[in-house]
Amino acid sequence: MFTSKSNSVSPSPSLEQADSDALDISTKVQLYGVLWKRPFGRPSAKWSRRFFIIKESFLLYYSESEKKSFETNKYFNIHPKGVIPLGGCLVEPKEEPSMPYAMKISHQDFHGNILLAAESEFEQTQWLEMLQESGKVTWKNAQLGEAMIKSLEAQGLQLAKEKQEYLDKLMEETEELCLQREQREELERLNQVLEAEKQQFEEVVQELRMEQEQIKRELELTARCLKGVEQEKKELRHLTESLQQTLEELSIEKKKTLEMLEENENHLQTLANQSEQPPPSGGLHSNLRQIEEKMQQLLEEKLLAEKRMKENEERSRALEEEREFYSSQSQALQNSLQELTAEKQQAERELKAEVKVRMDLERRLREAEGALRSLEQGLNSKVRNKEKEERMRADVSHLKRFFEECIRNAELEAKMPVIMKNSVYIHKAATRRIKSCRFHRRRSSTSWNDMKPSQSFMTSQLDANNMEELKEVAKRLSRDQRFRESIYHIMATQPGAPSALSRGGK
């Protein structure tokens, strides 16, 4: 019954580019081809072939011979055999006894159903799809579509405006967040610097404690030397007294010997006058010479003892000054140790405070980033409701509070130059104090170098080397820029800092 032809159904010109270019825009159709049609309005089993065209939302049909004219002229006849409006129609496949690829078109305003049939399943599917699509075009849908388009355009403009505003805010907040992230990285770097300075403080405190122990040992050695010198002074005093007593005895003996020599000479002279033989007097002269030699020896020993006493007195005085010097140095080291301990505790408190501030800043950053992500999701979401708008307003309020706090912190940081200026003044005063201390220590060192070294100095060369090493460490620390800046910061935060610091930090 079927006489199928491959060109019985032609696709829409929108599917064939060559045909669409050749047609006039007013004559373009969606689909055309030959279908089987059963008579409308009355029951009949007869099927006839007709040439059908789908134009917009209408189905036009002609006699089968019209197909050749349409394909030749590319214009359809404006006088069809019939026109079927497809708007609101229900199109569905249906199987008939003699037509397995039939299609039923029904509408509530139609007095019956319209039955059409294709010659293959492919043609049936193609016509069903195009008929169903054309059935969606109605006057009501057109009016509703125009109103919906206008409403969507207005909503789109409003959403685009809001999106642009939120994007501007988002860019500003992103820049602020980048600035906060940079500040957080700077805080981490400062934390590392503070950790290094804390380590330096601990090393300096340990060195000062070792130096204090060394000075204590030196003081004990000096005290022992002082005791030895005092004992030696006592022994020399006793020796001097003994020598003085011996000299006095020898003087008395010499005087007696001289008196005896004088008597002998007088006696010899008397005997000479009487022409008598003189007795020998050599023993007395030899005795006198021995006494004189012994007196000379005793005088030399006395001078030597006096010289040693003077040396001991000088050593005693030097040891006493040395003891006072080490006592002052020990007291200075003790004060420095206490100050460094206090500074270390202050630095630890500041470090803990900075860590706490950093943790609070990180928490606020996380909250701000979460609010920012939520706001971005709300902006990118196509579904808008009251709950999402309230959540977006809450996120915007949270970000507003966050950036207001950032502005207040920036205002506080703007006052930092005044504090730095005051810290420079404190640095100059501290430099003058350090120079004064170094000058006094240099003078004391010069006086010590001019003085004859004592036994304790002679036996403590290693301690002097330790002192020189400590001086070198102090010089290196004084040349360390970060160390000085941390010291100035600690001095600026001390309760005894100048009032200008407190005014600058308000």
UniProtKB/Swiss-Prot annotation:
PROSITE patterns per the UniProt record, alphabetical: PH_DOMAIN
Coiled coil: 146-391
Record's keyword annotation contains ATP-binding: no
Xref: InterPro entries: PH-like_dom_sf, PH_domain
Positions carrying Omega-N-methylarginine: 503
A Pfam short name: PH
Keywords, ordered alphabetically: Coiled coil, Methylation
Taxonomic classification: Eukaryota, Metazoa, Chordata, Craniata, Vertebrata
SMART domains, per the entry: PH
Name of this protein: Pleckstrin homology domain-containing family D member 1
Annotated organism of origin: Homo sapiens
Keyword Coiled coil assigned: yes
Stated family: Belongs to the PLEKHD1 family.
Residue span, PH domain: 28-136
